[in-house]
Amino acid sequence: MFDDIPVSVGPMNEGERVRGPDMYVELAGPKSYGFELVKVVNKAEDKVEIIGKDIDEMEEGSRNPFAIIVEVSGSNLEEDLEGVLERRIHEFLNYIEGVMHLNQRDQVWIRINKDSFNKGLRLKHIGKVVQRLFKAEFPFIEKCDVTIITDPEKVKEELEKAREIYNKRDEKTKALHEEDVDVFYGCVMCQSFAPTHVCVITPDRPALCGGINYLDARAAAKIDPNGPIFEIPKGECLDEKLGIYSGVNEVVRERSQGTVEEVTLHSALEKPCTSCGCFEAIVFYIPEVDGFGIAHRGYKGETPMGIPFSTLAGQCSGGKQVPGFVGISISYMKSPKFLQGDGGWERVVWLPKELKERVKDAIPEELYDKIATEEDVKTTDELIKFLKEKGHPCAERIGAEVEEEAIEEEEVEEEMEEVEGIEVPTMTLPGTFAGLPPGIKIVLYNAVIKAEKIIITKEEPEKKKKKKK
């Protein structure tokens, strides 16, 4: 596409993954820090500037702080377009051969592979590509400056300023709700990585990447009608609490190639929305307490279930619809409709301390101290104890379930006594079942409700009787 860029640039490179062994350097990401930002200014100068080390000055295999700030100017540009334009950085960087871009805002994660580095790719080339693609895709951008920062202290300094801008954008949509509008928006920008994912954006549910709210999406659909963000007619409200709309289902069905038939906007248990991989946080169901934990991308520890964020991410990313798991933005946690189909904040039992503090104002005051963090509990057993001690709403259900199980167990024992001598139903399975050897019998007790016991015994084959001569 560009003669002065040493690698190919275009949509054919979208979806390319850069694995660890193929990586030359990593920029920002979970083991470092960084951000991306677009700002509308009065007068840009069409310059590309690098502050800090370029790629060839970095150690191979290293992880480095990174920031990219794009300043655009034009007579028809408005500040409301910043978030929309900013999200396109994801697309433009993935156009570059050997560059993998994931996530958004202050969660950005970039890898550059060895082949592209060896071909001569440097940060100045990346800056030029971003600059040219912005001007080519959006003719109303007259001038575009791109500043790439790798100096650690400078990245930290600018990161705090960027976060203030992100928060300011998110505040704008608070007065608008789903019942106030007739149109929602969809985004398929991540389908190069998650082919069946359709992100549904409403006034009460920002994009799960956290980079696009309802007003951003509306602006994006207007300035680029054929782009990845489009209108979704709301249609008939089939279930207000769960957030089921006929128009949403129709569009999701079409855009997911028929893979997803129906979605609920505000439930993690019943037909949740699909997730790509750019989500800021994951809601996950904890069956032992009939409640939810939420882990954000920056959390490096383990959840009470004994697994980290990275493992949870693998459960629901890639455009899958997985009941019990759903990717969300942190802004959605501040929405009045947050998981309302599942009980909202009363169903949340665990958060990392950092995330809990970050959304403190959104958590009902009477629940704040009843939600555990990694400092309070390490296991589900400890979580159960914590919830009971604190009087969390979920603790009532835990007690009720235990009592119900005890009653059922007594009833079963009484029934078994009454019909003493009856043969317990058994099931002989094929030898290949679950990797078991042949000749194994599995006996299920009380299997009408659940499997209370599994007894594995070796079944000796009957000896063949010798025929009399």
Swiss-Prot record:
GO molecular function terms listed in the Swiss-Prot or TrEMBL record: acetyltransferase activity; anaerobic carbon-monoxide dehydrogenase activity; CO-methylating acetyl-CoA synthase activity; iron ion binding; iron-sulfur cluster binding; nickel cation binding
What EC identifiers does the entry list?
2.3.1.169
* GO BP field: acetyl-CoA metabolic process
- How and how many cofactors are bound, per the record note? Binds 1 [Ni-Fe-S] cluster.
For this protein, the record's Pfam families field holds: ACS_CODH_B_C, CdhC
Which UniProt key words apply to this protein?
Acyltransferase, Iron, Iron-sulfur, Metal-binding, Nickel, Transferase
Which residues make up the binding site for [Ni-Fe-S] cluster?
187, 190, 276, 278
Judged by the first EC level, this protein's enzyme class is transferase
Q: Which Gene3D superfamilies match?
A: Bifunctional carbon monoxide dehydrogenase/acetyl-coa synthase(codh/acs), Chain M, domain 3, Bifunctional carbon monoxide dehydrogenase/acetyl-coa synthase(codh/acs), Chain M, domain 5, Carbon monoxide dehydrogenase alpha subunit. Chain D, domain 4
Assembly and binders: Monomer. The ACDS complex is made up of alpha, epsilon, beta, gamma and delta chains with a probable stoichiometry of (alpha(2)epsilon(2))(4)-beta(8)-(gamma(1)delta(1))(8) (Potential).
Tell me the function of this protein: Part of a complex that catalyzes the reversible cleavage of acetyl-CoA, allowing autotrophic growth from CO(2). The alpha-epsilon complex generates CO from CO(2), while the beta subunit (this protein) combines the CO with CoA and a methyl group to form acetyl-CoA. The methyl group, which is incorporated into acetyl-CoA, is transferred to the beta subunit by a corrinoid iron-sulfur protein (the gamma-delta complex).
| Family as reported in the entry's similarity comment | Belongs to the CdhC family.
UniProt xrefs under PANTHER family: ACETYL-COA DECARBONYLASE_SYNTHASE COMPLEX SUBUNIT BETA 1, PTHR42281
NCBIfam families in the record, alphabetically? cdhC, PRK04456.1
Q: What is this protein called?
A: Acetyl-CoA decarbonylase/synthase complex subunit beta 2
- Species of origin: Methanocaldococcus jannaschii (strain ATCC 43067 / DSM 2661 / JAL-1 / JCM 10045 / NBRC 100440)
> What gene is this protein a product of?
cdhC2
